[in-house]
Regions:
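C-terminal structural cap/anchor segments
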Residues: 290-324
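Extended repeat-based scaffolds of very large eukaryotic assembly and lipid-transport proteins
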Residues: 34-261, 265, 269-294
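Amphipathic alpha-helical scaffolding segments comprising HEAT/armadillo-like alpha-solenoid repeats
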Residues: 207-219, 241-251, 273-284, 305-317, ...
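Short, flexible helical or helix-coil boundary motifs
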Residues: 132, 136-139, 143, 307, ...
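Bacterial Sec-dependent N-terminal signal peptides
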Residues: 1-42
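Short coil turns that connect the paired helices of HEAT/ARM alpha-solenoid repeats
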Residues: 219-225, 252-258, 286-291, 316-324, ...
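Alpha-solenoid helical repeat scaffolds
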Residues: 229, 247, 262-263, 295-298, ...
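Residue-level signature of the C-terminal ends
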Residues: 233-237, 266-273, 288, 299-306, ...
């Protein structure tokens, strides 16, 4: 078989993208233990026919945790049965995210006129198969065969010319960018196997191995796809397990906009009380990006019964934030009509920051409070210094 173990393969002398190699390290290795399970899958080309049996291999690392899956696939890729069969082995990580494929020696993927894929084709295919949001999810194979192609090349018999992928029909324009050129059907079939029916099967198999150590192993990876997988599992438990509160709070600065709300939901549901949740969320504010920090402040603002201690913690956490977030926090504190020595001390510091707009916002806030003598002196000095800008 033309391959390197568990890596994307293009040809026997193929160029392997370094990023693909790095991404797979730690998930699959040639020494992993493995188990094979017989599963049944719908053939995406013929979805009304009985399901077909496939052998799904699960791999386990040296700690006994699931590290990934593979499946050999031999499948038709067109509706008329005359296309060349696709023969590959596909690989996924433990969460069911497609990772790579390889083909048998001498049997590369092909396209028009049996032309083998070149490295650029495999690279594009790899990126397509890793895109779970692909437009291919919205279309069936028949859609790719909805338009007749131009005539066969001069001297080519029509039937013979149709024996390759993507020749007998033209690819509709809506999906041209979502498939490998002249290999639309092959792309579609492989995408369906990579991202649809098989994914929940692998996820159930991985979840069947869940243990506190395995969950912590996934969290320790700091990979938010794995973290989200764990959180979704925890949120499905009743009651929601609280023992991962600190770990997930610590991971929030790494969360993107697709995951931050999931993390907040876990902290809300797993915390023994709302103040525990608020303390942990506020503790993350100095390291959160603007969007994520705004969501935390928005959550606090939605609670009309915030305790004074929480307001003080909020004031103490905003010193290194950008203007808009400081404005949101001060607006929240102003709306609760609460002021204390602790809040005074934290906001007075903002008068000295280099960003004048932040300092001016702090000045406006302090001007409406009953201040200590030292704080009033600093505020007055600021207002005199910047009188022409206030």
């Amino acid at each position: 078989m033309s391959k390197l173990p568990f890596l994307p393969v293009f040809q026997s002398t193929a160029w392997i993208p370094l990023l693909s190699i790095c991404f797979l390290i730690g998930w699959l290795s040639p020494v992993d233990a493995k188990e094979t399970t017989i599963i049944q899958l719908t053939d995406p080309v013929y979805p009304k026919k009985p399901k077909k049996e496939h052998s799904l291999t699960a791999y386990f690392n040296d700690e006994g945790f699931p590290s990934g899956y593979s499946m050999e696939l031999i499948n038709e890729v067109c509706l008329d049965g005359v296309c060349k069969l696709v023969e590959v082995t596909m690989y996924w990580d433990a969460l069911g995210f497609y990772q790579s494929l390889e083909y048998p020696e001498g049997k590369p993927l092909t396209k028009v006129e049996h032309e083998p894929f070149v490295p650029a084709d495999y690279e594009k295919l790899d990126s397509i198969l890793k895109d779970r949001e692909s437009i291919l999810d919205d279309h069936e194979l028949g859609f790719l065969a909805s338009e007749k192609d131009d005539k066969s090349p001069e001297g080519e018999d029509d039937d013979e010319y149709q024996e390759v992928d993507g020749v007998s029909k033209a690819t509709p324009g809506a999906v041209k960018e979502a498939v490998v050129k002249d290999a639309a059907w092959t792309t579609w079939v492989l995408w369906k196997y990579a991202n649809t029916e098989l994914v929940p099967i692998m996820q159930r198999m991985t979840k069947s191995q869940f243990s506190p150590d395995f969950l912590m192993h996934l969290l320790d990876s700091k990979d938010w796809r794995r973290v989200a997988f764990v959180i979704n599992h925890l949120l499905g438990q009743k009651p929601v397990a609280p023992q991962y509160l600190d770990e997930i709070a610590a991971l929030m600065p790494l969360a993107g906009i697709d995951h931050i709300e999931l993390a907040i939901e876990y902290l809300r549901k797993a915390s023994p009380d709302k103040n525990t949740c608020y303390r942990k969320l506020i503790g993350t504010l100095p390291e959160l990006n603007g969007y994520n920090a705004a969501l935390v402040i928005e959550l606090l603002e939605s609670d009309g019964q915030l305790e004074n201690e929480i307001l003080e913690r909020l004031a103490a956490s905003i010193g290194n934030q950008e203007y808009y977030l400081i404005h949101l926090a001060l607006r929240l504190i102003e709306g609760r009509e609460f002021f204390s020595n602790a809040i005074e001390a934290d906001i007075v510091k903002l008068l000295e920051v280099q960003d004048f707009f932040i300092a001016r916002r702090a000045s406006d806030f302090l001007s409406n409070q009953k201040l200590s003598a030292s704080a009033k002196e600093k505020l007055d000095a600021f207002r005199v210094k910047h009188a022409d800008r206030l």
